[in-house]
Amino acid sequence: MRVAGLIRVVVFIFTIVTMWVFLRSYTSFSRKTIRLPRWLGITPKDIQTPKSKCGLSKICPNNFFAFKISSGAANVVGPSMCFEDEIIMSPVRNNVGRGLNVALVNGSTGQVMKKDSFDMYSGDPQLLLNFLTEIPDSTLVLVASYDDPGTKMNDKIKTLFSNLGSSYAKQLGFRDSWVFVGAKDLKSKSPYEQFLKNNPETNKYDGWPELLELEGCVPRKVM
């Protein structure tokens, strides 16, 4: 009986020790992070998911600028512009207004050169005409409408926007929605443009079409 009892004790102790070793090994493994081989020359903290600028759905290639533009919503929410991950115009920055909001960016460096808003309902259209006439070469032009961009729009202004690459400037009218990125002396029409006509049958808001959003990657210097 003593031998049998001793065997039971030994088996019991062996079982306890085995379980303890197993549990210790398991919990130790679960706390470890999977490490890459040293010969790769990198550690896990070096692996980071690249973040797109301006919240774009993709990362822009080298020598491209990231941008995102939203038109205003009716006459309630103002437009916003993001360029290279910087909000350059928005209601929060308190630098947008009714009509057309325009920002000029150096097409080579990406530096914001000038920005302003122009009241196209009761303001002086000559101010916008002067602004557009003085745009230097190799300049990117970002435009977002708010409330009413077209009442004071004249043929000279429409022609200047068309020369910047717009396909819809000549159609712009009362309370239309418009977002656009063009460039000085562009040889062809810009691919970065959206336009919605004010139409009571299709308007999303009472008296205004839906707001528009435009995002993408624009190449340096030449579009």
From Swiss-Prot:
It comes from the Eukaryota. Residues 1-25 form the signal peptide. Its main location: secreted. Glycans are attached at N106. Pfam families: ILEI (PF15711). InterPro entries: FAM3, ILEI/PANDER_dom, ILEI_FAM3C. It is found in: Secreted. GO terms for cellular component: extracellular space. The keyword Glycoprotein applies. The keyword Cell membrane does not apply. Coiled coil: none annotated. Keywords: Disulfide bond, Glycoprotein, Lectin, Secreted, Signal. Disulfide bonds join C54-C82, C60-C217. GO terms for biological process: aorta development; negative regulation of insulin secretion; neutrophil homeostasis; neutrophil migration; positive regulation of macrophage antigen processing and presentation; signal transduction. GO terms for molecular function: carbohydrate binding. This is Protein FAM3D. It comes from Mus musculus.
